[in-house]
Curated annotation (Swiss-Prot):
Top-level taxon of the source organism: Eukaryota
Localisation: Cytoplasm
Tissues where the protein occurs: Epidermis and hair follicles.
Organism: Rattus norvegicus (Rat)
Statement: the UniProt record of this protein carries the keyword Transcription: no
Protein name listed in UniProt: Protein-arginine deiminase type-3
UniProt function note: Catalyzes the deimination of arginine residues of proteins.
The keyword Cytoplasm belongs to this UniProt entry's keyword annotation: yes
One BP term from GO: arginine deiminase pathway
Lineage: Eukaryota, Metazoa, Chordata, Craniata, Vertebrata
Alphabetized InterPro entries for the sequence: Cupredoxin, PAD, PAD_C, PAD_central_sf, PAD_N, PAD_N_sf, Prot_Arg_deaminase_cen_dom
Length: 664
């Protein structure tokens, strides 16, 4: 859509003008008026619609219905809806009258050439180029919204390339085009018009840094046909007059929304009049389309799994075999990162977060590489980035990161409704410190990136009481057949003490924790009686419980949860340098693969031949239709302050809900 253009007519000679189909042109009849004029008439050739707007308060009327009083408040509006076959093949005639004269005092003639120019794309998110009445200069959220969507072309479709597809100015393989959005320029009108008129495709300097445009200048089955015409350091392009009604362009995103970039990009096509050699060219018409760059989206543990990742290190063979068996039961692929690549860094959950980005025509999984940069640093880029698998990362400028910047400290809830607002893609959960305190927080560049995606608003929880400091140390989500469709699992020292007190009451106080642990180092067993008589341990767990309770209230408020949506999982913590670590393997730090749960084996007290902690967890989760598998991670993970979830990662199905249908 373009602003109205004003054309002035003259009594001395006919005037010529170019108009664009469907776009209103204002005709100024007041610049040259015969003396004595008090009335006028306006007529046009067939195909020219002329209206008179008497005032701002009154609706416009057709001009050819009567003679009009000459009043400078009147506005003459001309519209043509079909392109011309020849130059100046239509015209408008204005006759100036005096009430004292029978014949007109004078005539003014405006010759018109109509050209149809539109810049189109998928405006209504229905995977087609739409030419309807929506305002292409706007991007509207919601189920009734509209606007074009642009993917960040962050995968690597060409196997011989070392870089992401959007890192160069060429199309290396035709499959790369599937990650781009189509933009079509349509023009109809006399060819001779373009002897002294030019079409310029252009964007702003800021937007040129965020996207790249390729013009199809040859056979579409040849990569050489795709010429880079807009992008960094290139803000405008004169579209050559190639034979044909349509010119096709492919647009790729270069960066996700972030601080200083809300994700909105505009492209314009402008028709310039270059007919006067003595003056600079003048704009006649501009059409604009707006894209929103598709956000990076996280997937909660309640979505179906597609692929499980785990690292093979020197002492976790049994663990990997257990994860492999669980993946087989869940029907998903298993990818093992060998020790030669991980260099004994087993914390694959901390290294990356697997999400996706989506447009109507394409869904692309994207790995978000954390700034922790351990020995696994190269794995996401070297092994996951590839054909139809994108990559993104954020690094603080001063390279200052803390343990909170590992992605065990990055989770997302299932869809929720809280305080009357729907969050159909859930809410991102990150850990930080208490308001006003000076503890650890997630680095600003990661926070800015997550916040800018808009579709999964952040909730910050308190984790600085934990030695490692990750949200997955005290919470998890599992699917459920009722209620909200999920349950929030929270680690609970209180629930653990109640369980142990019950077992002590029934005469099992001498039952031991940590029996049967196999590893390089001997683990000292401890009885229920000893746990319940250890006042230091009890006091520290009261502190841990208070921290979890703080988070419980935040989660209830920000996710709209009730107590019936929360399950307390028995867990104890111990103090290490005044911070908390799991006393026995952290039960909520589990691998969720649909209905199959891979839970750290707690090595709890054996009562009547069964671990009472395992039995308690089964009694809480199996009524939800979940299958509990307890995996021994004690030596390779728990002794290093991590568990099953920390040592695995999962790529999941995208949400069925389309992000552009939500209202942030």
């Amino acid at each position: 859509m373009s602003l109205q253009r004003t054309v002035r007519v003259s009594l001395e000679h006919p005037t010529s003008a170019v108009c664009v189909a469907g776009v209103e042109t204002i005709v100024d009849i007041y610049g040259s008026v015969p003396e004595g004029t008090d009335m006028f008439e306006v007529y046009g050739t067939p195909g020219v619609d002329i209206y008179v707007s008497p005032s701002m308060e009154r609706n416009r009327e057709r001009a050819d219905t009567r003679r009009w009083c000459f009043n400078k408040g009147l506005e003459i509006i001309v519209v043509m809806n079909s392109p011309s076959n020849d130059l100046n093949d239509s015209h408008v005639q204005i006759a100036y009258h005096s009430s004292h004269e029978h014949l007109p005092l004078a005539y003014a003639v405006l010759y018109l050439t109509c050209v149809d120019i539109t810049l189109d794309c998928d405006m209504n998110c229905a995977d087609r180029q739409d030419r309807s009445f929506v305002d292409k200069r706007q991007w509207m959220w919601g189920p009734d919204g509209y606007g074009a969507i642009l993917l960040v072309n962050c995968d690597r479709d060409e196997v011989s390339s070392d870089a992401q597809d959007n890192c160069d100015q060429c199309v290396r393989c035709l499959q790369d085009l599937e990650d781009m959005s189509v933009m079509v320029l349509r023009t109809q009108g006399p060819e001779s018009l373009f002897d002294d008129h030019r079409l310029i495709l252009h964007t702003s300097s800021c937007d040129a840094e965020r996207a790249r445009v390729f013009h199809v200048c040859g056979p579409e089955d040849s990569c050489e046909a795709y010429r880079c015409v807009l992008g960094p350091d290139r803000m405008s392009y004169e579209v050559p007059r190639l034979k044909g009604y349509e010119e096709r362009f492919y647009v790729e995103g270069l960066s996700f929304p972030d601080a200083g970039f809300p994700g909105i990009l505009s492209f314009h096509i402008t028709l310039l009049d270059d007919s006067n050699e003595d003056y600079s060219e003048t704009p006649i018409f501009t059409d604009t389309v707006v894209f929103r760059v598709a956000p990076w989206i996280m997937t909660p543990s309640t979505l179906p799994p597609l692929e499980v990742y785990v690292c093979q290190v020197r002492n976790n063979t049994c663990f990997v075999e257990a994860v492999e068996e669980l993946a087989r039961k869940a029907g998903c692929k298993l990818t093992i990162c060998p020790q030669a690549e991980n260099r004994n860094d087993r914390w694959i959950q901390d290294e990356m977060e697997l999400g996706y980005t989506q447009a109507p025509h394409k869904t692309l999984p994207v790995v978000f590489d954390s700034p922790r940069n351990g020995e696994l640093q190269g794995f996401p880029y070297k092994r996951i980035l590839g054909l139809d698998f994108g990559y993104v990362t954020r690094e603080p400028p001063d390279s200052s990161v803390s343990g909170l910047d590992s992605f065990g400290n990055l989770e997302v809830s299932p869809p929720v409704v809280a305080n009357g607002k729907e969050y159909p893609l859930g809410r991102i959960l990150i850990g930080g410190n208490l308001p006003g305190s000076r503890g650890r927080r997630v680095t600003q560049v990661v926070r800015d990136f997550l916040h800018a995606q808009k579709v999964q608003p952040l909730v910050e929880l308190f984790v600085d009481w934990l030695a490692v400091g990750h949200v997955d140390e005290f919470l998890s989500f599992v699917p459920a057949p009722d209620g909200k469709g999920f349950r929030l699992l929270l680690a609970s020292p209180g629930a653990c003490f109640r369980l142990f007190q019950e077992k002590q009451k029934w005469g099992h106080g001498r039952s031991l924790l940590f029996e049967g642990v196999i590893g390089d180092r001997r683990v000292q067993t401890i009885s229920i009686n000893q746990v319940l008589s250890n006042q230091s341990l009890i006091n520290f767990n009261k502190f841990a419980q208070s921290c979890i309770d703080w988070n419980r209230e935040v989660l209830k408020r920000e996710l709209g949860l009730g107590e019936s949506d929360i399950i307390d999982i028995p867990q104890l913590f111990k103090s290490e340098k005044r911070k908390a670590v799991a006393f026995f393997p952290d039960l909520v730090n589990m691998l969720v693969l649909g209905k199959h749960l891979g839970i750290p084996k707690p090595f709890g007290p054996i009562i009547n031949g069964r671990c009472c902690l395992e039995e308690k967890v089964r009694s809480l989760l199996e009524p939800l239709g979940l299958h509990c598998t307890f995996i021994d991670d004690f030596t390779p993970y728990h002794m290093l302050h991590g568990e099953v979830h920390c040592g695995t990662n999962v790529r999941r199905e995208p949400f069925a809900f389309k992000w552009w249908h939500m209202v942030p």
